[in-house]
Amino acid sequence: TRGRAMAREAVAKHPKDAVALFYLGKLNLNYVWLELGTLGHRTGWNEYWEARHSLDESLALAPTYRRARVARAWIDYIVDTRMPWGTGWLLGGGNKKKALRVMNEAATSGADRYAYAEALFGLWDMQIREKRTADALKSARLLAEMFPNNPEVARFVASGTRSTHD
């Protein structure tokens, strides 16, 4: 809550700041996913829309901003793959193919190690969900090089196909 308030203040002071808009969107998405996905609470409508709009604004200002592209791709993916059609329509629609394409583009190496890792983890997760095991294994091997102590990645690479997501 405090982080979202700080992000809102930053956006109020600098409404054309793509980074502040990204953080507002990302923090709202984290809240929605915690409430809905982890806790099972059916709440977060306003936070979802604030996230979607602020990420869209961030990308309008900085179309190549990798972290905003990744967060927005997650919205497209989850709305298209996890929501019933009517709910997906109410949430503004999603696009799984676009989400996978954007995540794949974002998961190319770059100067920003953190943004690259975030995109690569996202791509790996989507590949597992899509049962693209060969692609997921390639992504996991790259992640294992970056994070050799990550037990989930190590298990996936060792198994060759399975993940704790299954």
Model-derived regions, located:
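Short coil/linker segments at helix-helix boundaries
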Residues: 1-64, 70-122, 129
